[in-house]
Amino acid sequence: MNNRGGFSHPPGKFHMRGSKTYTPRNGGQGQGQPQQAAPAFDQQQQQQQQQQQQQQQQQQNFDQQQQQPQQPQQQQGGNNYYFQSKFGNKSHRGGYHGNGNGNNNGNNNNNNTSPNLNSTSHNNNNNNNNNNNNNNNNNNNTHFTNSRGGHRGGSSRGGSSRGGNSGSSRGGSRGGYRGQSSFYNSSYQKSGPRLLTSIVSLPPFSGGAIIGVKGSLWGLLNKATTARLKVFKNTAIIKCADAQQLDRAKEIVLKLKNTSPKYLSLIDYKGEQKIKFVHQPSFSEVILESGAIDPLATDGVQLMQDLINSHESQYVARLNETFSTLYSEKGSSTPFIDIEAGKIWYLHSSNIPSTPMTADKYELYTESLASVFQPSNVINEQFITSSQYKLFKQKKQFTFISVLDTESLDLLCIKCSEEKITPTTTTTTNTQQSPNSDSSEYKFTDPFIYKLNHINSSKVLFPQIKSGSDLRVTIDTHSKSKLVSGTGQHQYDNLIKFIDSIKIHKNSSGNNTYQIPDSNLFMTESIITRKVLMYRSDDNSLQFHVNEDIATRYTTSTPEVNRESTTVFCTSPALYDLFKSKNWTVDQASDELKKLSKNLRLLVSKHLDSTKFQPPSADHTTQFEQDDEEEEN
């Protein structure tokens, strides 16, 4: 009885015309091996054949009429045979090929081996099938040594062949055996190295990622690692097949994440790949002398403190709780306070800060400091004028160029001065590249290399009343040490030569053109409105640098817009001495902290509402030129 469609076949197997299940190669036995089958296997065959013999003969003619014209040689015996597949599962084989059973042992003498069975009559088919049934009953013990072929894809070469008369070893007159391509190919067609993924969160900055320009960061990672990078607004996704390269790429992104984006570009100077952040090349510093301003001298400051003490009980409680955490280490370490970022560092040495305080206290402290700047809407602002502070030092213009070494991953800072090139030596250059008559050519000179030991970046909102807008300040906390010549500076000779090769063309309108030879400069664009730098200096004071920076775009084709910026130093020797004495109370630290906060608040307000800052005159530049060698460490 034909069992077509009556049984489910194991997945992954190829079934000819959807009705047959094929055995493995040689039926699971090797060619030439003794024809021994399992006893249970033979008994099952014998019992099934005896029970179904009469039924086969009665329904033979009926089943023959139900066959498809393409398969006239198909056996109608309906014997149910089982074999052990190569996957360890029993598979049903109902109605195998009678004419194509491939027996070459001489017992099946009546098998038709002609490929032209399609033209035979039904009587011949019936006679052939009857003979095949009888022969199959006599050859039960030897049937499963046959190949999968048969006459459909069969071969007269024996049981080891899967090929056919069509000339293909795996073919057949009807397509024959297709192997197991549908099973194995689907399993391995998508194989390949698995990419490891690392996700780094990025704080938003100026409408974009704090990393800076996406193309520049991609170019850096592409040259330094084998990782792939995708930068979103607040997230950077790094993918790499190698775990070591992934860690290196993540370390680079984390270092850039904690760096304020001055100007970001990937440059190739003399064959070395570096990343550079360029500060504004023109700004001056105004240092507030200690004691020049008494925070308690004005009614506005006194009103500020009265409001804090009387109406902001929640602020006082949180601030006291924060300072109480300093007791555990005040006997062995000096607290380093970034007042604007709301972080407290413990300086075990002058250059290496310890781990900052926990995140929950950081949030409390940040919220508390915000109330210092704006506890109420009725505060009268007190703006600093020139009569309220003493200017005792003024430095000439210089440029900071911060560099990330992609080999050692060290952050370096290069301080350069701008020197005007005399027209007699650059007449040809100015004529060709700077047609404007009011243009002057400058270059960077006297570079000094500093190693940045710690960099931290954060943002603080200064609420403004008089100006009608808020001031967003980016705060960088870092310490740096100068690399003395002879102690490793020689490895940065190429960097120094590259800085010296940069030429700057300036005009009266403020549009500057930078010529950078022998480099691959990516398009860069970064916007910084304000930033505050705070670090511990050697003169025992905590210094706050309030810089006013304007956006600059660095490209190799278009002119660059560069404007002046301002820096203000606000020091607090009293707070530093208080911590250094290791004999302080929470109230004392809180009072000094409020004073310093108010001083910084007034300084920022002054610069917002003042007129455009005027650069120092030539007399001042000459007078204090010798002070440039005393750069803070």
Swiss-Prot record:
Claim: Coiled coil is one of the keywords in the record: yes
InterPro entries noted in UniProt: Integrator_complex_assoc
Biased composition (Gly residues): 152-178
Protein name per its UniProtKB record: Putative uncharacterized protein DDB_G0284097
Segments crossing the lipid bilayer: none
Biased amino acid composition, Low complexity: 32-80, 104-148
Region (Disordered): 1-188, 611-633
Gene Ontology CC terms: phagocytic vesicle
Higher taxonomy: Eukaryota, Amoebozoa, Evosea, Eumycetozoa, Dictyostelia
UniProt keywords, alphabetically: Coiled coil
Coiled coil: 580-607
Sample GO molecular function, one term: histone acetyltransferase activity
Claim: Coiled coil is one of the keywords in the record: yes
Superkingdom, natural source: Eukaryota
